[in-house]
Amino acid sequence: VLALQATGFLREHYREPISIHDLSDHLSYSPSQLTRSFTRAVGTPPIRYLASWRLHEAKRLLISEGLDVAEACYEVGYSSIGTFSRRFTRDVGLPPAALRRSADWLAEVSLPPVSLLRPTTTRVRVRVVVPSTLREQLGTEPYQWVGTFPTPMPCGPPCTGTLRRGLVEVLLPVAPGAPWLQVALIPGGADVTEHLAPREPLVARPHRLSDHDDVVAVEVGPARPWEHPMLVALPALWPG
């Protein structure tokens, strides 16, 4: 309940200069207690979550609303275009202007299979499980993204990853320092916004891989309302 209330407040007021004290006053928690409980439930501290949500909204404004970089920067609460662009590039995987260009060509093409791999001694076979109740909304041949990240949050380009059409088993290298497995499914008929700034993706809960994992089965489901947004613009894996 706390995570839902806190993230709801942050999503509603993301344009404002919110501090941890503003959030703790709103929820009647001490800042330290709120930070601990929030981080345990969401996987990241409240102010870091707020920063991520601002960037997620900026993606949508750049793609769907046609705002330029400066307009999107100020609309989501930043006062410095340089700071906004640096953080956007770090967490989304490409600069804001490049994301707008990506949206233009992605709207006219069908993404081919992509592999972002590197030589490693460890590999894991990943099987994606989709409940029967969700298969219809995915349509035929959904886009299946599987990748490894340094943290449970899908920020920045994955260390290793693949894009495939349809639900297929993949053999994925696991690089040192990137043990977190992330999986997302995008419907086959999704528009460009759903590819680059998905509102309600089907995702698996972050899974920490161990040295003993040979085969991992992960079940996907709708992202929970308080979960961290999927910041990385996954089609940036494709060089175009």
Descriptions of predicted regions:
Residues V1, T89-L134, C159:
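…primarily DNA-binding HTH/wHTH and HhH modules…
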Residues G8, P17, A41-E75, L106-R118:
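Terminal helix-turn-helix DNA-binding modules in bacterial transcription factors
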Residues G166-A175, A217-V218:
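Exposed aromatic-hydrophobic patches
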Residues P17-L50, E75-P95:
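Basic/polar phosphate-binding segments, predominantly the helix-turn-helix DNA-binding elements
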Residues G188-P225:
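Structured interaction patches on ligand/partner-binding surfaces of diverse proteins
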Residues P176-G188:
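A short, solvent-exposed beta-strand micro-motif common in secreted/extracellular proteins
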Residues T133-P152:
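Short, ordered, surface-exposed loop/turn motifs in non-cytosolic proteins
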Residues M153-V168:
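Short, acidic Ser/Thr/Gly-rich low-complexity loop/linker segments typical of extracellular
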